[in-house]
Amino acid sequence: MKTKLTPIAAAAAVALAGAVAVPAFAQTAAAPAAAASAAKAEEVQQVIVTGIRASMQSSINQKRNAESHVEVLTAEDIGKLPDKNVADSLAHVSGVTISSSSGTEGGFDESDRVSMRGTGPSLTQTLINGHNIASGDWFVLGQTGTVGRSVSYTLLPSEVVSSVVVHKTSEASLVEGGVAGSIDIITRRPLEFKQSLTVSASAGLVYSDLPAKTDGQFNALVGWKNDVGTFGVLVQGFSETRHLRRDGVEVLGFDTIQATDPSAQAGLPGLVAGVKYPDLIGEALFLQERKRTGGTFDLELKPSNDITLDLNGFLSNQEATNINRNYMFFGRKLGGAQVPTSYTVSDGYLTSATYDNAGGMMAGIYDQISRPGAGSHSQYLDFDGKFQVTDKFKLTTQLGTSTGYGKSPNQDVAETVVGATQASFSLNGPHNAASWATNATSTSQGTVGLNSTFNTDSGDGWIFGDGNIKVNDSEKWGQLDGKYDIEAGPLVDLKFGARGSRHERSLWNVIGQGPTAVNWGAADYAAACGGATTDFRCIPPASGNYPSNFGKGLNATLPPMPWTFSPAQLAAYNAQYANRDPVGRADYSADFGLKEDVEAAYLQGDLEGESWSGNVGLRAVRTKEHVQNYEAHAVAQPGDITTSAFGNFGLKTTDHTYNDLLPSANFNLKLNKEMNLRFAASRTMTRADYSQLAGSIAYGAVDDVNLIGSGTGGNPDLKPVTSNNFDSSFEWYLGQNNMFSVSAFFMDVTSYIGLASVHKTLNYIDNAHPNGVAVDFDLTVPVNTSAKVHGVEFHYEAPIWGGFGAVANLSLTSSSTANHDPMLGTSKNSYNLGGYFENDWLNARLQWNHRSSFYSGQDRNSAYFQDATSDLSASLGYTISKNFNITLEGRNLNKPKLRYYTQADQPRASYVNGSQYYLTAHFSY
């Protein structure tokens, strides 16, 4: 396969060759400059900071001395912020945005994903100590739906961090994988501590006001090194429990009025075929207990000044059992089938309606889903070696392995129907929660389920959803890097290296459960229950209700306090009536396996002159991709699996090899002692998301099997995302803790991943067609296209008076794609405003973060946007003695509303998660 040099690659190669060719006498000060640079780098590594202002100055120093455009957060700075995982801390960096969900499940109260410069989370690479980390998601939609390259930061507590380096421009020596940039989390090492013995511990409580629960939080670290500093051991552990509650109103898709529907034939003005109406409107109550436990260890050996050996590891396990209830308006049964007594139509959408039917109608449907044992996990083991072979030649090695998973072993489900003679809804615009009501009693169970007067198409106690879900993720890597001091003109040194890795991601043996009786109508239900068609003895009695303050702050009118089943009742109900046959209910459409073998090599030259420095380099990468997934066939083909209720499936294998050349150049011009001017150009790449390469086919309900349905799927032929990036920045260091910077960037994403439509015939199963029927679908699938992103970032921090100071930054971003679809993750503006105070015994910080609306992905075959959101956090610390202090922290103090809407300016969801308060005692020795 031939590889063609891009313009950036050619420029970098010429610059590097020219630098090598310059005679040594061209700059007699090269050796002193190199020595000064090395000393400067060593000084940065050995900085020990305490206090807010000292840590901010340390971050400023590291940014100032870096050869490329970076932002740095130190452990002390993170510790003085009201942050509970690394993503919370990164939210304060200009150009970095966070989201509190992995995909389209809606946000929670903790930061989850990190993205840079107006792109999606998958285009930002997360490293720990320079290597990748395997990860997993606890939420079922993140496990089977949006399965991206991004890391879940809910597994990364802030306590494990020594520093975080945000690379806004690329270098050849950096591991490839971040189109927009990369984030390197540096963990603590025992020989870095000043004292021979370091002990620190924190114990505290967290109160979450919406669930009204208090839980314990604990963290401890012990670091020891011998007196001569040649051997050290560090052990750290954490255990953090929290209760979550999320109140929400969800609009789950839209259906279309057909010409044959009664509502279209009634002759009412504006109520015609083609008008869309909400499929489901629900009041969704999510409850969860999260327990994050784990720790780190580090063994560091330095037998001489020339050799350092380090073995380190990390483990984080998150138990995330949850229950999701949704009491819903059943628009699918009303919008076309019932003629409204009053209504409004706006821009082709039925935005409100009232229905009256004395004979009764199926006005609502109620889903209760318990996910016991849900969770996520991440761990790694890494060995690093540093060898100063000669005065001029240094070698470093890295060998490691990382594993992770996300799991949902079972979903215990019950779906019941709500009969009524009156029902109504109102959508209330794209930025507000929808409302709905019926004249049924929501607070008590009453006679639930099947009633021939209402409808028997959807029976009582229906069971659905995938189970036996465990997404395994792993990576193994080996790396060898060299650095040779040249001191030839402006060329200070040459860096070179090679890296090999294997990444694997898989999900096999998914079970698409259903009820024990395939046709769960009145007769089958009665047979299963051992009674008449009106006998509901199978249904357990209600065990409780929604909280009385559910939905406070959402400004929606909803049925009050729906009755509930307990998780134990749902488990018992499913144990008796769920069909989880691993053969007949095998859901092969959700299975996939992916393996990537990557080989990379690079050459980089570090440059330095009298008032400038920089680097140029080239990284060559080969990716061998092996994707396996099942393809559905309407007619069985030779070798197909034909035992699944979901149709005929054949295993499909796709292999590709991709070669990429990634040049880079970074230059830092020192205009004077206070001002730096930086320029950078690079070509970057990120491999396609796992769900894009091997995504399962998912489709919505079909009212008429003779019409064309819609759904989504994957594309194993996707090429990696590549981009030509350009960056310039101006930095003005005005004094202690005082700096201003402005930067501009442009990304020409030459191989972005967008969406297109393909036509397929699939085996469709519903209650009316238990054995399946061939239905045509238009599936939205990912394809390679192109995009452009550009923006400007401003940052300012300064002391004000006494112990007071302020930090502020603003990012302005714009993007476009070749197919004119919105670009994932682009917020036109985001900003952070912060203030701090510090003296010998008291420190305080106040932080306001804002992010404007952005495209979040596809949900129910429609573009899905998150509305603008802001959050307020604060921390207060009181120092009792040198070894003991207390902190009080608050997160989400403004009780932010998370709003989502569709591309057609219709509401999708509104959520509130409440506020969280942390009281913690810290001890150190």
Placement of each model-derived feature along the sequence:
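N-terminal periplasmic "start-of-domain" segments of outer-membrane beta-barrel proteins
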Residues: I48-L81, I133-T144
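Outer-membrane beta-barrel translocator/receptor signature
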Residues: Q143-V151, E159-V166, S173-L268, D279, ...
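Outer-membrane beta-barrel signature, preferentially recognizing the C-terminal barrel domain
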Residues: S376-S378, A586, A590-V598, H656, ...
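Gram-negative outer-membrane beta-barrel transporters
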Residues: A744-V749, I753-K760, Y764-D859, N894, ...
